[in-house]
Amino acid sequence: MRKLLIIMGIVSLTSCVITFPGTRYKHLTEDQKKRVVLCKAPIDSLTNDGKVYLVTIEQMQKFLNSKNRVLIYEYASFCQSEHCVNPAVIENECTKAGVQFCIVSVSYEGVFNISVQNTPILAIEPTIFGKKIGKDCSKVFFDKLTGTTWKTRGYGRYYSYIKGKFKGCYDDYSYALTGN
């Protein structure tokens, strides 16, 4: 009986690890997998063309340096927080405020259902850290992109940049737009 309980415990722990939100790439259809591509052009030349572009920190930094104001949304389709807002709403608010909007998805889950008009869908190029594009990869990606750690900048999904310089990380996109 004890061996059975140990085996059941191991199986349940393994199941949790397997189902923990990661890339979810293996759950994409073959057509969707073909639409996940390495970004080979400047980010500001991309359009919302149904593809997910895998980007590096260097590509993102070059993009940020070329813009006056940028709001990056660290998008997670599985997020249930009141602060996880439909990207189309944020895109509209950014357009009104004259702020460049950028989506960086931390998972492929639901990424092809994002409805935005003009914003290309970006994801972290998973091989840059030798890890999958899960929680740890996004944390390291944004640590390097902001020049801070999540402990010092606080946890938020919205990153504000002015002329390539990180200004803050916010829970609420409206604060990221106003800088308050």
Residue spans for each PLM region:
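Positively charged n-region of N-terminal signal peptides that target proteins for export
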Residues: 1-4
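C-terminal motif of bacterial Sec signal peptides marking the signal peptidase cleavage site
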Residues: 12-15
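N-terminal "domain-start" segment that seeds a small globular fold
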Residues: 17-66
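Short active-site neighborhood of thiol/selenol oxidoreductases, capturing the structured segment around
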Residues: 61-90
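Flexible, charged surface loops at secondary-structure boundaries
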Residues: 62-67, 95-96, 151-152
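Short acidic, S/G/P-rich loop/turn micro-motifs used as interaction or catalytic elements
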Residues: 76-82, 108-110, 129, 166
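Conserved segment of the thioredoxin-like fold in thiol-based oxidoreductases
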Residues: 94, 100-138
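Thiol/disulfide oxidoreductase modules built on the thioredoxin-like
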Residues: 131-180
